[in-house]
Amino acid sequence: MYPKMKNDLILRAAKGEEVERPPVWIMRQAGRYLPEYHKLRAKQSFFEMCQTPETACELTLQPVTRFKGLLDAAIIFSDILVIPQALGMQVVMLEQKGPHFPKPLVVPEDIDLLEKTPNISAKLGYVMDAISLTREKLDGQVPLMGFSGAPWTIMAYMIEGGGSKTFAKAKSWLFRYPEASHKLLKIITDATVSYLIQQVYAGAQLLQIFDSWAGELSPEDFTEYAYPYLVRICQEVKQHLKKKKRDEVPMIVFAKGAWYAIDQLCDSGYDVIGLDWTVSPKEAVRIRGNRRVTFQGNLDPNILYGTREIIEARTKEMIQDFGGGKQGYIINLGHGITPGVNPDDVRFFLEKCHQYGSA
């Protein structure tokens, strides 16, 4: 049994309960903007850090320790690309460039080279070990979040071989090989469902699905190639936990750039919808109507490079525009924090979230 929770604010907010203030955490809060991250990074490669439970645990705890009492969640230090690795693909992290697949998928026949039903607990056991260890070490300070990438985003990486400006290779699959695209998306979805369930068994108390490249799709293509798989993940994870008589775990979907899908996502079964900074909070609240869905976001991460006056003003305005945050709102950035941000400015932002969220 894990230690009793001292702060369950984000769990209550995610379920739509009224709270004393909106909880706050930051996407990529364990990462490159922290000097203590670089001390560990100097000793190990990126994926070695992910694969060493003690290191992943230490990295997860770094922001919680540094900003003691200011963050309302920890998110396990890992990467969305562990799923392609579990499916048998090689992924390396290149300095300054990001992820690189030496042998990306080129034609539909390449799907046959994948390990279609991998043993997730064997392949990604190190993530579960990191989650269990972190849950113990957190000692109930804040809930621990697990995560995965969304099928379309994972597929895009597997075909592009890394990030891309145009996603021409991945999108051409959708328009040249629609059947093979669905076949690949199904393989990724099945592995992801299994992976998320294992994370809950290991101790994850919330789950976030990152659809980082959702905004590359038109509304029609999102509806065909992204949305159904996001819904399946949510349904299958929740159904499995219910069947096993496990506590329900709130699920968050973050489809970056898919502002056109807010209405759709409000009906997707996810408890929380992450919004990026291109979305007007007031408009999102209007679209949601009286549906019991919590929003998460959505400050432009680059505002943290701004003056203290602007950080404060924009934070206050955001909380007010989401309705004050006492119900249906989790404060976050509209995307991951960037490496050049000064941790002191992060502390200032978090303090202002507490100040205006409690008002």
Swiss-Prot record:
Catalytic reactions on record: uroporphyrinogen III + 4 H(+) = coproporphyrinogen III + 4 CO2; uroporphyrinogen I + 4 H(+) = coproporphyrinogen I + 4 CO2
SUPFAM superfamilies named among the record's database cross-references: UROD/MetE-like (SSF51726)
InterPro entries: UROD/MetE-like_sf, Uroporphyrinogen_deCO2ase_HemE, Uroporphyrinogen_deCOase
EC numbers, comma separated: 4.1.1.37
This protein's UniProt keywords: Cytoplasm, Decarboxylase, Heme biosynthesis, Lyase, Nucleus, Porphyrin biosynthesis
Any one cellular-component term (Gene Ontology): cytosol
Coiled coil regions, renumbered to chain: none
Binding site for coproporphyrinogen III: 28, 30, 32, 79, 157, 212, 335
Pathway connected to this protein: Porphyrin-containing compound metabolism; protoporphyrin-IX biosynthesis; coproporphyrinogen-III from 5-aminolevulinate: step 4/4
Any one GO MF annotation of this record: uroporphyrinogen decarboxylase activity
Classification via CDD domains: URO-D (cd00717)
Compartments where found: Nucleus; Cytoplasm
Enzyme class: lyase
Positions bearing the site annotation: Transition state stabilizer: 79
Any single biological process term in GO: protoporphyrinogen IX biosynthetic process
Family: Belongs to the uroporphyrinogen decarboxylase family.
Description of how the protein assembles with itself and partners: Monomer.
Described purpose of this protein according to its UniProt entry: Catalyzes the sequential decarboxylation of four acetate groups of uroporphyrinogen-III (octacarboxyporphyrin) to yield coproporphyrinogen-III (tetracarboxyporphyrin) with the formation of intermediate hepta-, hexa- and penta-carboxylate porphyrinogens in the heme biosynthesis pathway. Acts on a number of porphyrinogens, but only coproporphyrinogen III can ultimately be converted to heme.
Official protein name in the record: Uroporphyrinogen decarboxylase
Upper classification of the organism: Eukaryota, Fungi, Dikarya, Ascomycota, Taphrinomycotina
